[in-house]
């Protein structure tokens, strides 16, 4: 991905995120081309929650949908399926809350600091300032991004198939 989407671009120490949050509340100007330390921390939280959802979904059962069960429910005990299902449902609600907070933070950023974050996410262009994290973004190849997506899908589907799960 582009330089601002790489993990190294938004992986900050916890105290850096806390310090940034304090600076934000005190309206001390700090500008980042990519995610700021607090936003980067939330990205890692979101990635962890989505990964947990995906993993738990493999072993969950839902009789309220046409899907009924994850592809690996037949490989574990009923107690494990019940536990995975409870956690899957609970974590979904947590995930929605964190997503909502992340979106609300973007709007708060626009109001509090008068800096648009949504527009640059859509257009890929951000007004030039003195950025703390990097001087300018290095755009990656769209073809390489597509190849990575295809490879990731193949790894996931192949893993499920190798584990004996059903796809589709």
Regions found by a protein language model. Give the residues of each.
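Membrane-embedded alpha-helical bundles that constitute the cytochrome b-like, heme-associated redox core
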Residues: 1-168
């Amino acid at each position: 991905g582009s330089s601002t989407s790489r993990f190294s671009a938004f992986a900050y120490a916890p105290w850096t995120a806390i310090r940034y949050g304090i600076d934000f509340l005190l309206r001390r100007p700090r500008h980042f081309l990519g995610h700021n330390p607090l936003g980067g921390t939330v990205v890692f939280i979101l990635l962890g929650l989505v990964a947990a959802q995906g993993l738990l979904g493999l072993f969950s059962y839902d009789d309220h949908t046409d899907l009924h069960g994850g592809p690996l429910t037949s490989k574990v005990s009923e107690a494990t399926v019940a536990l995975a299902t409870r956690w899957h449902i609970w974590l979904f609600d947590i995930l929605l809350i964190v997503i909502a907070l992340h979106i609300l933070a973007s709007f708060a950023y626009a109001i509090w600091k008068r800096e648009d974050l949504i527009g640059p996410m859509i257009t890929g262009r951000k007004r030039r300032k003195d950025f703390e994290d990097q001087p300018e973004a290095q755009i990656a190849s769209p073809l390489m991004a597509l190849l990575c997506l295809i490879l990731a899908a193949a790894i996931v589907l192949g893993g499920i198939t190798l584990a004996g799960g059903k796809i589709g």
